[in-house]
């Protein structure tokens, strides 16, 4: 008699994805972030659902409905702060997941990688429209500034902006549609995650050595379910510490002031996880050029499979490329810091140098390093 998980049509899918999945025996803790992203997504959907039950997407009542959630709804403050800080946690895991993909050459699985980039764009869009919903000062002005960037598109730019706004400024129509987008996008992300996993399981997971591991694969359960559970415990500990002790640490104090179109905040800036892209945008004094650099700063990831010149997949045994990788990580952290600073010397020049270095490392230095390493290994 066959085991039910191997014969039942639905359980068979789960079995092939999470139980009997052949997995490399040597994948490290850096591979935990995929499952942690799944946890973050579920956390965001559930907390978001409960927030949506009490939130009103109207300019007159949006701000006070968030206040009502925090003050009057049972554990509303906890749900709200879990949702707000859950977004930060999501992006921390996302950036580490992408970093691991770059370090270990996972981008050579082109379909999985490209769907991952699409997921990154959708997650950024979801986070942006979600940040507008509390209708505080930074919500309003952030929405105004970022949507206005589309006006840089020749010919159709201004019409496109007014179409997205639903009027001649960010107002009630904008808030209502942003709430609709914020509600539907996580479900689209969930569907794409399934496709992401489908393509990943077609090829099997990569490993730190970047070598084929078909001869020594182990079942996913119990080895990696246990390992992932350990990651979940650590992540939730960190997350609840942040939520319960430092809930406003990653937010902007300006968002505790209701939106006022007549009063501009001294420094308009997005949430911390967009600051690196915002710094790249600001480093170019031309509006269209800045917008193109902003989009390309993410799209450049799609070029990685075509810029891979090394005969080794992973960076594990490539000291020159490793050095460049960690300079790139430092550069992204520098850009994040610059994005939160005012536009004045010395921040302007630091931002410009860091932006040039970002593209220089990815597009030119990393491929050259791969060729040099091939030559040194006499390959």
UniProtKB/Swiss-Prot annotation:
Other known facts: Heme 1 (or BL or b562) is low-potential and absorbs at about 562 nm, and heme 2 (or BH or b566) is high-potential and absorbs at about 566 nm.
TM region positions: 33-53, 77-98, 113-133, 178-198, 226-246, 288-308, 320-340, 347-367
Protein name: Cytochrome b
UniProt keywords, alphabetically: Electron transport, Heme, Iron, Membrane, Metal-binding, Mitochondrion, Mitochondrion inner membrane, Respiratory chain, Transmembrane, Transmembrane helix, Transport, Ubiquinone
Cofactor note: Binds 2 heme b groups non-covalently.
Family matches, as SUPFAM superfamilies: a domain/subunit of cytochrome bc1 complex (Ubiquinol-cytochrome c reductase) (SSF81648), Transmembrane di-heme cytochromes (SSF81342)
Positions annotated to bind a ubiquinone: 201
Quaternary structure and partners: The cytochrome bc1 complex contains 11 subunits: 3 respiratory subunits (MT-CYB, CYC1 and UQCRFS1), 2 core proteins (UQCRC1 and UQCRC2) and 6 low-molecular weight proteins (UQCRH/QCR6, UQCRB/QCR7, UQCRQ/QCR8, UQCR10/QCR9, UQCR11/QCR10 and a cleavage product of UQCRFS1). This cytochrome bc1 complex then forms a dimer.
MF (Gene Ontology): metal ion binding; ubiquinol-cytochrome-c reductase activity
Organism: Cratogeomys castanops (Yellow-faced pocket gopher)
Cofactor list: heme b
Residues bound to heme b b562: 83, 182
Positions with a binding annotation for heme b b566: 97, 196
Keyword Heme: yes
Gene name linked to the record: MT-CYB
Family designation: Belongs to the cytochrome b family.
UniProt function note: Component of the ubiquinol-cytochrome c reductase complex (complex III or cytochrome b-c1 complex) that is part of the mitochondrial respiratory chain. The b-c1 complex mediates electron transfer from ubiquinol to cytochrome c. Contributes to the generation of a proton gradient across the mitochondrial membrane that is then used for ATP synthesis.
GO cellular component, one term: respiratory chain complex III
Subcellular location: Mitochondrion inner membrane
GO BP term, example: mitochondrial electron transport, ubiquinol to cytochrome c
Membrane topology reported for the UniProt record: Multi-pass membrane protein
